[in-house]
Regions:
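C-terminal target-recognition/interaction regions appended to catalytic cores
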Residues: 1-139
Length: 139
């Protein structure tokens, strides 16, 4: 808990006092992982949500103010799932690992919507152009 409490918004394990440093981060190789044990910052862009976003030590998934990692619902909201979206059938037991995998592996719904609308718009314009060309040719 002390490590989490010493992580500042936008910061990571680099902000910890020496006595809280993990041995792996004292080694040269371990110093390259700058986002692990990271705390999000309200003013920054959210991190990429991975399948392990519910773990504080797996990336910049620390809540900006509270001493904890993101919840499943918070990760889903960052991914643009509707707030009332259900990831399992009613009555089924919640398995955090399974749901975090669904959320982390998902194409964000809003991104999918934008791409779909773009494809539809392109198709509609293309269809209109083909129809116009056909009319000009007398067909």
């Amino acid at each position: 808990m002390q490590r989490i409490q010493h992580s500042i918004p936008g910061g990571s394990w680099h902000d910890w006092p020496e006595n809280l440093m993990l041995e792996c981060h004292k080694k040269e190789k371990g110093q390259t992982y700058t986002s692990v044990y990271g705390r999000m910052c309200w003013e920054d862009v959210a991190p990429t949500i991975t399948t392990q976003f519910t773990g504080y030590g797996t990336g910049r998934f620390g809540h900006p103010e509270q001493d904890r990692a993101l919840t499943l619902r918070e990760g889903a909201i960052i991914q643009t799932f509707p707030e009332n979206y259900s990831f399992l059938p009613e009555g089924e037991a919640v398995v955090i690992k399974d749901i975090s995998r669904q959320i982390g592996n998902a194409v964000p719904p809003r991104l999918g919507e934008i791409i779909g609308l773009s494809i539809k718009e392109h198709y509609t314009k293309r269809k209109y152009v083909r129809k116009s060309e056909s009319i000009k040719k007398g067909g």
